UniProtKB/Swiss-Prot annotation:
It comes from the Bacteria. Residues 19-198 form the ABC transmembrane type-1 domain. Induction: The complex is induced by either hyperosmotic stress or by low temperature. Osmotic induction is sigma B-dependent. It is a multi-pass membrane protein. This is Carnitine transport permease protein OpuCB.
Length: 218
């Protein structure tokens, strides 16, 4: 315990810098994942056969070891922050894509037909009916993806991208448990804080009528 306290005292500034790097890399990958996976997931609901193929391909990509992905990217993008973000982006895709597809497909068809009866365009149906009624499922995928990515981002230090993984791998190389814990504890806290914040965001994004209906059902 004394060693850990000493670590935080001696590495306070570096810890803040590495935490910021870790958060930047992780959130950049998740935001890219959202930008690609949510629209793609919505489009795939219009073509279930294509959806099975696309989700299958993304699922296979996620089974590839992260170090293998990094090794594949390095010859094209070199080392540093960008290849780390691209690699993490690949891992961020599946939970968001799958949950968006499942959530939008699960929207009550009567609501969609009612919207069409009111003269809504496809875009209006997506924005006003499908997304609001599937936001909790979509956000569950985003929350899961964010936690995964924050954990996997420790490997970014292997290619010089920085982050809290620097402490962990330095600790492993030097047989310094204090460095290992000094990196692992902030990663865990960061994942919990981001998951909590996204949970609050999900609550805010869920339409009030839907929240009240769920709370009344409980």
């Amino acid at each position: 315990m004394d060693a850990i306290v000493t670590f935080f005292q001696e590495n306070g500034h570096n810890l803040l810098v590495q935490t910021w790097q870790h958060l930047f890399i992780s959130l950049s990958a998740v935001i890219l994942g959202i930008a690609v996976a949510v629209p793609t997931g919505i489009l795939l609901t219009r073509s279930p056969k294509v959806a099975n193929f696309v989700i299958g391909v993304v699922s296979v990509l996620q089974t590839v070891p992260s170090l293998a992905i990094l090794a594949f990217i390095i010859p094209f993008l070199g080392v540093g922050t960008l290849p780390a973000i691209i690699a993490l982006f690949i891992y961020a895709l599946l939970p968001i894509l799958r949950n968006t597809f499942i959530g939008v497909r699960g929207v009550d068809k009567n609501l969609i037909e009612s919207g069409r009866g009111m003269g809504m365009t496809n875009w209006q149906l997506i924005v006003n009916v499908e997304i609001p009624n599937s936001i909790s499922v979509i956000m569950a995928g985003i929350r899961l993806s964010a936690v995964y990515v924050i954990a996997w981002a420790t490997l970014a230090s292997y290619i010089g991208a920085g982050g809290l993984g620097d402490f962990i791998f330095n600790g492993l190389n030097l047989y310094r448990p204090d460095l290992i814990l000094g990196g692992a504890i902030p990663v865990t806290i960061l994942a919990l804080v981001v998951e909590f914040a996204l949970g609050k965001l999900e609550y805010r994004l869920t339409p009030k009528a839907i929240r009240e209906a769920r709370e009344g059902g409980e």
